[in-house]
Amino acid sequence: SIPGLDKVFKNDIERPKVILVTGPPGSMKTSFCYSLMSSYLRDKNEFGLYATLEETAESHMHNMESMGVKLSAKMQISDMTDLREIDQIDEVIGDSAQTDYVLFIEKMIQRFRRTHGDKFSVLVIDSLGALYSLMSESAEMRKKMFYFFKMLRDNNLTTFIIMERSLTGESQLLGNEGFLADGIVMLGLDRQRGKLVRYLQVEKMRASEHSMEKHAIEVTKSGMTVLGPLLTT
């Protein structure tokens, strides 16, 4: 896994789990998920899928390479920008039937499950906010999210869902994701001795012994490293 992450987690995270990776813009949420999936799969006979709703797969691959994270045959980046474009075209020509993205993600999981079987173990969804923006606002949304999280667990996956959080720490979304999720990993910035330091903090992780302290992280061309607990001032 990511060097130094054993300072935060005392034991392995067993699947199935749905883990929210939250933080303000620019807090390296995408990089963290990339690094974690890539380093985890390196020594495993397993498969991972990175599903992006916001950027193209090509853009993500370029970002990974610039971070020093190599895309392996055990990992695929899938984008849904084509489907979004189809939706917009339908809107212009007057077809009101919109793609059900929750159902689309479920079908995508089933397709990779057929190909890889139980070796398909890790999924990243980038991001929950983008998923909401693609769904029509309705009173059914909370129920749909409950079903969505359950479906991810039923597929025996460790799923990391990226979720934007404002600088004040408040989630800008529906508010029940934290309750539904098995884990919450917060990425942020803290001022230490006049310098801004990136940190990682596990706010919650069911069935896993972990530190709740903020841990400094460093991102270089060779990847991400967890340095150790932040000094409290």
Give residue ranges: language-model regions.
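Structural recognition of the conserved hydrophobic beta-strand(s) that form the central parallel beta-sheet
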Residues: 50, 122-126, 154-165
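Pre-Walker A adenine-sensing motif
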Residues: 1-12
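Short hydrophobic/aromatic beta-strand immediately N-terminal to the Walker A/P-loop
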Residues: 18-22
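Conserved P-loop
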Residues: 24-93
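NTP-binding/hydrolysis catalytic cores, primarily Walker-type P-loop NTPases
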Residues: 2, 15, 97-101, 107-121, ...
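Conserved nucleotide-binding/hydrolysis micro-motifs of P-loop NTPases
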Residues: 54-58, 81-85, 128-131, 165-169, ...
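Phosphate-binding/switch loop-helix module in NTP-utilizing enzymes
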Residues: 86-154
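Phosphate-binding/switch region of NTP-binding enzymes
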Residues: 158-222
